[in-house]
A protein has these predicted regions:
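Short aromatic/hydrophobic "clamp" motif used to bind/position activated sugar donors
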Residues: 105
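Conserved donor NDP-sugar-binding/catalytic core segment of glycosyltransferases
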Residues: 116-149
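Short, acidic, metal-binding catalytic loop of nucleotide-sugar glycosyltransferases
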Residues: 47-56
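A recurrent flexible, glycine/aromatic-enriched loop bordering the glycosyltransferase active site
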Residues: 140, 161-180
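Glycine-rich, basic loop-to-helix element that forms the pyrophosphate-binding segment
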Residues: 84-100
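A conserved acidic beta->alpha catalytic loop
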Residues: 48, 63-71, 112
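Acidic helix N-cap motif at the loop->helix transition within catalytic regions
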Residues: 40-43, 68-75, 117
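N-proximal low-complexity "stem/linker" segments adjacent to membrane-targeting elements
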Residues: 2-48
């Protein structure tokens, strides 16, 4: 296992100690990305994942029969490519999950640019045995159109979230929220 190593780009920048289970073994972690016909934006996402501060993870791409060069992009970065028969995001994720044996799975989209410490900041929460899931908002970058920023105001609150194109990291720390 290990972070992505894109061809010709060197090693992932990760130097963070892997998250360990009680037996001292590292958790088997994956980032799962469903996609269909979005190779160029997927290339951007995988490029960012290749530079994560936490590098002990695998990337799984669940591809719903793309007709573009998605598989080539996956090969470029060493991501595992799964051809799935579905035509929607939920089914693509579920199809891939049934084929995976990872203990922690992080989800993102093929048009979301994760911050360079995204994996590290999500994985660290699982050091607490009471944490079962982690999530957060997906903010539009500063240079996105005004309409995307309006969507942030409407959807990216602590009450509900909805992804906007090319999410960027908000300022501040993740905040644990508990539910009964």
């Amino acid at each position: 296992m290990g972070g992505l190593t894109p061809l010709g780009m060197g090693e992932a920048s990760g130097s963070v100690t892997p998250l360990l289970k009680e037996d001292g073994e590292a958790f088997k972690i994956a980032v799962l990305i469903p996609t269909i016909n979005n190779a160029d934006e997927l290339d951007i996402v995988l490029g960012r994942l290749a530079k994560q501060t936490y590098s002990d993870f695998e990337v799984i791409i669940s591809d719903s029969k793309s007709k573009d060069h998605t598989k080539d992009v996956c090969e470029k970065y060493g991501a595992t490519w799964i051809e799935d028969p579905s035509r929607n995001r939920a089914d693509a994720c579920n199809y891939a999950l049934r084929q995976m044996d990872h203990e922690l799975v992080l989800f993102t989209d093929d048009d979301t640019v994760p911050p360079l410490d995204w994996v590290e900041k999500l994985v660290r929460w699982f050091d607490n045995p009471e944490v079962g899931a982690v999530g957060g908002p997906n903010f539009a970058p500063d240079d996105d159109p005004f309409g995307a920023k309006c969507a942030d105001v409407a959807f990216c609150t602590k009450f509900m979230t909805a992804g906007t194109r090319y999410g960027a990291q908000p300022k501040g720390e993740l905040v644990p929220i508990t539910h009964n």
